[in-house]
């Protein structure tokens, strides 16, 4: 039940299609730039950035989002999100945070597919 769930993750084996890993035909820098632009538009602030681990931490008053960008090869990346929401009752907010992030990235980047290594 999503009513009390405060932790959501996207991934290759997610049971909800809206939470499956997204693959892009873009290099790491292009993907990261698009992520930061989308984050600003959705009122997130950048709390942490580690290019070595290819991770970003985004914050907003209602949640924290950890973003992992995996460089598959020089021109392909994947993006996964982990969302933690505050409060006892979340009404599935984590999923509602992840889906708009993916939708905006899909418009800015060259979307390749969902969970291709499933």
PLM feature segments, named:
Residues 1-118:
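Ser/Thr-rich, low-complexity intrinsically disordered terminal regions
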């Amino acid at each position: 039940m999503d009513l009390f769930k405060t932790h959501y993750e996207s991934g290759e084996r997610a049971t909800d299609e809206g939470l499956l890993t997204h693959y892009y035909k873009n290099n790491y820098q292009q993907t990261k730039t698009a992520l930061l632009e989308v984050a600003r538009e959705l009122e997130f602030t950048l709390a942490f950035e580690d290019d070595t681990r290819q991770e970003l931490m985004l914050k907003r008053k209602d949640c924290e989002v950890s973003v992992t960008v995996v460089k598959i090869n020089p021109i392909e990346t994947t993006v996964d999100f982990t969302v933690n929401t505050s409060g006892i009752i979340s009404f599935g907010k984590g999923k509602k945070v992840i889906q708009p992030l993916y939708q905006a990235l899909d418009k800015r980047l060259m979307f390749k597919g969902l969970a291709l290594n499933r």
